[in-house]
Regions:
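A short alpha-helical cap/connector motif
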Residues: 1-136
Length: 136
């Protein structure tokens, strides 16, 4: 799993979980990942670009996997700002990612095709009622 080495650090506390999940995906020859809730990724601090490791960096890790296996990552987020930011820090994977600005429930209802791995990580944290209605 050398293709994930850039993501293995002490701040990425969910790395081992992602690594184990993707090992299983490789064994099963999975190529299609669908993710609800796009990682926000890099943040700008003065002139430094820093990764926001609190997100777990799911979007770039799944994109790296998609590149490795010749697959595709479909990711959706209700926030256009999050999608646009993710597009910037994953630009080298653009042929392996399809971004969608959409409510996750609506996105999944309309998704056509096989899903090998479904990663549910969307939440309306600012609105607990909307989050409970999502039930994701």
């Amino acid at each position: 799993m050398n293709f994930l080495n850039n993501f293995n650090n002490s701040k990425n506390i969910r790395f081992k979980s992602f690594e184990e999940t993707l090992k299983i995906c490789i064994k099963r020859k999975h190529k299609i990942i669908v993710e609800t809730g796009t990682a926000r990724g890099k943040t700008k601090f003065f002139f430094f670009n820093q990764y926001n490791w609190k997100d777990g960096m799911s979007t770039p890790m799944f994109a790296e996997y998609a590149k490795y296996v010749g697959g595709k990552l479909y990711t959706c987020d209700i926030s256009k700002k999050n999608i646009n930011n993710a597009k910037k820090f994953t630009s080298k994977y653009s042929e392996y990612i399809k971004f969608n600005v959409q409510n996750s429930v609506e996105f999944l209802e309309k998704f056509e095709g096989i899903i090998d791995l479904l990663y549910l990580d969307s939440l309306d944290g600012h609105d607990p009622i909307a989050a409970s209605n999502h039930q994701l």
